[in-house]
Amino acid sequence: MPKILVLYYSTYGHVESMAYAVAEGARAAGAEADVKRVPELVPEEAAKKNHFKIDQKAPIAEPKDLLEYDGIIVGAPTRFGRLPSQMANFWDRTGGIWAQGALIGKVGAVFTSTATQHGGQETTLYSLMSSLLHHGLVISGLPYSFQGQGRLDEVTGGAPYGATTIAASDGSRQPSKNELDGAKFLGKHVAELAKKLTAQ
């Protein structure tokens, strides 16, 4: 049974919801899936003032946790078309793991949230992938066998580079069923790939 880590950062809860959907998909494929988050860097007083979702139940991840998993699926909201500092800080602490080549050959994938359809989803996914590629992970996208990618009857996230959701400028829009289905599909797909690779 492959072990999958869903590692995320979420400011207002949108990526958190997607993370649990990703984990659900991985478990549906027979994998063991853990959801963990990276540490918040914003002082608690400022986070509360800006209405951050601070009551997230997922445990805080440490870089050494990465070694325990066959697949690592990373999610974070956009910050001007790139990954946020909280997620960058986590990967900046993995130099020793990189030097050992300890993550080479594991399966990786990414997911994100933006305020609008054109708010930097694909560039954020690419920036999340960058650390995974430097660590030698085998990257999986969200294939078009997920039929929800081609929908034109609603405003929806989803890209071949990873699962996405649209939150609206004020954060009022929660992930839709189609977006959560895309997240589940991504988790299932990564789990199936990890199962094949670990069977070698």
From Swiss-Prot:
Cofactor: how bound: Binds 1 FMN per monomer.
Reaction it catalyzes: a quinone + NADH + H(+) = a quinol + NAD(+); a quinone + NADPH + H(+) = a quinol + NADP(+)
UniProt-annotated binding residues for substrate: W98
Keyword Zinc-finger: no
Names of required cofactors: FMN
EC number: 1.6.5.2
Record's GO cellular component terms: membrane
Membership in a protein family: Belongs to the WrbA family.
Name of the gene: trpR
Binding site for FMN: 10-15, 78-80, 113-119, 134
HAMAP family: NQOR
A molecular function (GO) term: NADH:ubiquinone reductase (non-electrogenic) activity
Name the UniProt record assigns to this protein: NAD(P)H dehydrogenase (quinone)
Residues of the Flavodoxin-like domain: 4-190
Alphabetical list of PANTHER family matching this protein: FLAVODOXIN-RELATED PROTEIN WRBA-RELATED, FLAVOPROTEIN-LIKE PROTEIN YCP4-RELATED
Pfam families for the chain: FMN_red
Top EC group: oxidoreductase
